[in-house]
Structures are given as C-alpha cells and as structure tokens.
Amino acid sequence: MKILYSLRRFYHVETLFNGTFVLAGRDQETTGFAWWAGNARLINLSGKLLGAHVAHAGLIVFWAGAMNLFEVAHFVPEKPMYEQGLILLPHLATLGWGVGPGGEVLDTFPYFVSGVLHLISSAVLGFGGIYHALLGPETLEESFPFFGYVWKDRNKMTTILGIHLILLGLGAFLLVLKALYFGGVYDTWAPGGGDVRKITNLTLSPGVIFGYLLKSPFGGEGWIVSVDDLEDIIGGHVWLGFICVFGGIWHILTKPFAWARRAFVWSGEAYLSYSLAALSVFGFIACCFVWFNNTAYPSEFYGPTGPEASQAQAFTFLVRDQRLGANVGSAQGPTGLGKYLMRSPTGEVIFGGETMRFWDLRAPWLEPLRGPNGLDLSRLKKDIQPWQERRSAEYMTHAPLGSLNSVGGVATEINAVNYVSPRSWLSTSHFVLGFFFFVGHLWHAGRARAAAAGFEKGIDRDLEPVLYMNPLN
C-alpha cells in the first residue's frame, strides 16, 4: 500500500550525525533516520520488521536455553539452589519439575529437557528471523494481507491487540493445566515443609480474586503481592485466562469507539510507548513479588525474603536461649520491651527486638506455632519441630541483603554465608529494567505526541542558552 505522507515530514526529530552514510540502500535523507536508529528504518516495512521481531525472540529463547543448560551443568544437588546463584532452575522447580518433599531436587533431567527444547526453538526462530530480514518480502500487505498492516489502521491494530490477548490468556491456562492435571506445582505450604501437589480446590470466587486488586499496597495489606496460597494463585490464572481470551475476541470483533480514536495517538511509535509502559508496570510488580512473596517464589528455591530471614534469626535465638533456661515469655530486652516476644500494635504476640517491624511475615516454618492471638507461648515451649529449627537457622544465614542501611537486626558479614540471594538479583534487575522501560515510555510517548501534533523538530537550537555564554577558556 502506498504511504500517504512524506516520511521526512512525519518523522519530526532531526538527527544531525553522519547524514551521508548509506546502509542497505537507505540513507538519512530518504528515510529521515540515521544508521544508528536501527529498526526505525523498518517502520513501514512490515516484512523486515517481522524478521527483526522473530530474530529478537530467537535471541531471547536462545538465552533461556543456554542459561538453563549452564545452570544444569553447574548445579550441585547437595546445596540449596539459592546458594548457587541460579535464577532459571528455581522457576522450573516451582512448577513442580524434578523436586520432591522439602524442595529437594530428585532429578535434573527435566531441567536438561527444558534447556534443549528452548535451544531447538531458538534455532527455528533464528532461521525465521534471518529469512524474513534478508529473503522474505519487504512488506506483507500485498502478498499476505492477513499479516500486513498500516500503523494508522485502527481496526487492524485492535485486531492485533486481540490476538496478543488470546495468546496471553492461553499462557495463563497452561499454568492452570500444569497445576490441575500435569503433575501439580510446588506448594511451600504443604504440611511438613513443602511438597509438589495437584491443586484440587481452586479459588474461583470473584470476591476473593478481585479482593486482592482492591487491597491497599501498603504493609499488612500488600495488594496482589500478599497472595499466600496456591489455590488463589491458580484460580487467579483461571480468571486471567478467561478475561484475556474474551477481551481478545472482543478486540478482534469490534472497532475502536470514537472516544478511543480521539484519546490515543495511532502510530507505530505510540504503540511502542504503550508497550513500554505496560512492561515497566510488569517490571515493578515482579520486583515486589519476588522480594516479598514466598508462595509464588518459594524460599526453598529463591532463599528467604528479607523479613523471613530477620524473623528466622529471632526464632533461632529464641530456641537456643529457651534450651539454656531463659523464660522467653517474660525476658526483657535492653529497651524494656520483650527480648524474645512482645505485642504488636493490635495485640498479637510477635517476636521482639529489631525484627518487630516484620511482625506480619507469614512463612510455612512459622505458622504452625501461631494461635488465635499470634505466637502461642505453649507451642513455642512444646511443639517446635527439628525441621523448623533447621530451616530457620538456614534462612537466618542466607538473608537477601547486601545493604548499607539497617537490616532488621540480621547478623551480616562475619557470622553469615557470603552470597547474593537470587531474590536480590531478580528484584533489583526487574526494578532497574522497569525504571528504564518507564523512561523509554516517556521518550517514545513524547516523540509520538510531537509527531501527531505536527512538530518537525525537538527544541529550537537557536534559543539554546549555551550560545550566549562565554567560552570556558
């Protein structure tokens, strides 16, 4: 299809670098983009852009497969995953592959299979990417109209959105099928310290599922990050799957309403900015999820959360001193508050000391010792099991720290194992990526709005303050 506007008029941002450089028969003069603007040269070449996207998917899947095999090759079954710097095997273990009671790895073969499948898939995607980038048609509109598009075609854009939503919904259903029928998933809350189990009693009540979305994001509430049982997680994926699939069908069958046509900018760069904003939100949510949640991210694989390590230390010393004859119910600490136990603002019995700030932690090794009013003194005296002692001592020395500020009283450096927790890696990386994607969203949204408003340039350099200043020398 013929493009109706002049490219140079439409792409408003001047690029004053090497304007004479010609690459693949394209130069800055005819495209409005310099060589370093990469895929911008492909904005109106749907076939070439398809090649770039498929090749990019191939790189992503190649990394997943290669890193997966790298982790399998370096894996030591005798050590916990979180002590070995692993970030992919914990995800596979959480899905119930290769692990048994207590999160012990029984078989690494499923992990090997996963790596090989991803490598093979990446080869297929890589071939497709190279084919479409070099050999396939430059544009798809003429030969494959179903796959062709023009960025301004609002109806086609919402159809593509619908197809994406259906695929996301099917992805959510894959997790549901794994949990219900194909071996189950790892449940850190299973009695006796966690196990793989099939989820039989799904939470489908909209009040519960959407209650998470309506909760406050702050302490003790924690929005969706506070989810702490697998029935709710898998039930949420059932809801999400249906919402995405039906939303996708709706977007395929309908055209954008007038208010939507007016509200949005309808250009390739605008869609890029919307996508970056969504990915930024995902990154920030993932950061909070992996940092605070020990149900979707079991501590057996990812290491304890910060609050969990701090509470584990308080518990470990309570056990030790109780054995040495301390009366943990009444001992006073240096501040006059309880040394081992105290009361929260709402009256529950909680651990004393600096870890009091984490009093709303829930963890499978601790919950059996709670009664209706918080920690139960008689259970603490009579019911502590060896596995709870072992696990809390292990978690106490593997806090996800590395911080310059207060660490909730956790013994760091000299007394602890020197390691970096996967929770630290995953939450920090997703926060940083979320931030950069947000900056990318602002950048591309600004450019897209400027183009829609008809500016050709960014700032007018004639009014640049530096032009009126004396040279430094």
Curated annotation (Swiss-Prot):
Binding-site residues, [CaMn4O5] cluster: E367
Classification via Pfam families: PSII
Subcellular location: Plastid, Chloroplast thylakoid membrane
Residues with the Phosphothreonine modification: T15
GO molecular function, one term: metal ion binding
Propeptide residues according to the Swiss-Prot or TrEMBL record: 1-14
Domain of life: Eukaryota
Subunit (UniProt): PSII is composed of 1 copy each of membrane proteins PsbA, PsbB, PsbC, PsbD, PsbE, PsbF, PsbH, PsbI, PsbJ, PsbK, PsbL, PsbM, PsbT, PsbX, PsbY, PsbZ, Psb30/Ycf12, at least 3 peripheral proteins of the oxygen-evolving complex and a large number of cofactors. It forms dimeric complexes.
HAMAP family assigned to the protein according to its UniProt record, in alphabetical order: PSII_PsbC_CP43
Protein name per UniProt: Photosystem II CP43 reaction center protein
Native source organism of the sequence: Brachypodium distachyon
Taxonomic path: Eukaryota, Viridiplantae, Streptophyta, Embryophyta, Tracheophyta
Gene for this chain: psbC
